[in-house]
A protein has these predicted regions:
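Helix-adjacent hinge/juxtasegments
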Residues: 2-5
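Active-site-adjacent substructure of cysteine-protease-like catalytic cores
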Residues: 7-66, 104
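Noncatalytic regulatory segments and standalone regulatory/sensor domains
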Residues: 41-42, 53-105
């Protein structure tokens, strides 16, 4: 297994990993009202697992701030999420994948 912490430029880069069945952990930060549907109102830093995208491009995550298992899976607005990620951490992403995939950045 290979693991890297890397800055990615946008959600399209995350999508390329998701399309290869590789989830990506991202660090987000947001103020009240900046990420609709989040289980916390604001945060200076919070890790989420991006696990997919809807047909319309919204971001499907596992958010550990959900109070119950059924509240962990969330779908966030793509533009709001990308802003919270890029402004919050500069695009920091944690990628863990089998070495055989030959991750390149």
């Amino acid at each position: 297994t290979e693991a890297v912490v890397h800055r990615l430029p946008d959600l399209r880069s995350v999508e390329s990993f998701i399309n290869k069945k590789v989830p990506v952990v991202v660090s987000v930060a947001f103020k009240k009202g900046e990420l609709s549907g989040a289980p916390i109102s604001s945060t200076p830093g919070h890790l989420l697992v991006v696990r997919g995208f809807t047909k319309t491009g919204q971001v499907i995550v596992n958010d550990p701030a959900g109070k119950t298992n059924s509240q962990v899976r969330r779908i966030y607005d793509r533009a709001q999420f990308e802003r919270a990620w890029l402004r919050g951490s500069g695009g920091i992403a944690y990628v863990i994948a089998p070495t055989s995939m030959g991750l390149t950045f």
